[in-house]
């Protein structure tokens, strides 16, 4: 098995194969981002604030191409808060502005059943509302229950990332063609 490592061409071919796998995954992600018009077309529910609609660990598929409809109260959306890079999945609880008096619409959000207040405590300092540019996914078009637990486990236990990458690298190096 390890004899392939002695052959420089075989080792280079395996490294290129590994690079091809990574670049294909990246291109699929970017393609899905373009199709869904969302920088993050797939998100994982990280907390229980959306139960019973979505459980912790559910994988959500987003669609952001509702160009001619406005985000309405009661709709579940995914948004980013300034200076934080973790998307939040919550329901719109309030909407301000019509586009005439207030030039931009503002929204307030909160989880479905577990929160007793709005999400302003999650916003960046000085940010009281969210605007359309903060919303990265307007429609949840599908979900896969519990599939996102892999992401949660990898973020809660960083050593698992190293083990997983090591196993993937070992499989690529030891595979025969």
From Swiss-Prot:
CDD domains attached to this UniProt entry: S26_SPase_I
Give the sugar-modified residues.
115
Give the InterPro entries listed for this entry. Answer: LexA/Signal_pep-like_sf (IPR036286), Pept_S26A_signal_pept_1_Ser-AS (IPR019756), Peptidase_S26 (IPR019533), Peptidase_S26B (IPR001733)
Q: What is the name of this protein?
A: Signal peptidase complex catalytic subunit SEC11
A Gene Ontology biological process noted in the UniProt record is: signal peptide processing
Show the GO MF annotations: serine-type endopeptidase activity
Q: Where are the transmembrane segments?
A: 15-35
- Active site per the UniProt annotation: 49 (charge relay system), 90 (charge relay system), 119 (charge relay system)
Q: What class of enzyme is it?
A: hydrolase
Compartment(s) of residence: Endoplasmic reticulum membrane
Q: Which UniProt keywords apply?
A: Endoplasmic reticulum, Glycoprotein, Hydrolase, Membrane, Protease, Signal-anchor, Transmembrane, Transmembrane helix
**Organism, per UniProt?**
Podospora anserina (strain S / ATCC MYA-4624 / DSM 980 / FGSC 10383) (Pleurage anserina)
Similarity section: Belongs to the peptidase S26B family.
* GO annotation, cellular component aspect: signal peptidase complex
């Amino acid at each position: 098995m390890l004899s392939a490592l002695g052959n420089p061409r075989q080792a280079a071919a395996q490294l290129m194969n590994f690079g091809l796998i990574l670049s294909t995954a990246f291109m699929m992600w970017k393609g899905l981002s373009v199709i869904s018009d969302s920088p993050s077309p797939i998100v994982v529910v990280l907390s229980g604030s959306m139960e019973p609609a979505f459980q912790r660990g559910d994988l959500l598929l987003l669609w952001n191409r509702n160009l001619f409809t406005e985000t309405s109260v009661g709709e579940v959306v995914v948004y980013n808060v300034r200076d934080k890079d973790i998307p939040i999945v919550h329901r719109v609880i309030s909407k301000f502005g019509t586009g005439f008096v207030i030039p931009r619409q503002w929204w307030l959000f909160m989880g479905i059943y577990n929160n007793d207040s709005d999400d302003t405590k999650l916003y960046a300092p000085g940010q009281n509302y969210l605007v359309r540019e903060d919303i990265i996914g307007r429609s949840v078009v599908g979900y896969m229950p519990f599939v996102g637990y892999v992401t949660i486990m990898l973020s809660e236990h960083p050593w698992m990332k190293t083990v997983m990458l090591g196993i993937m690298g070992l499989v690529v190096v030891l595979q025969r063609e």
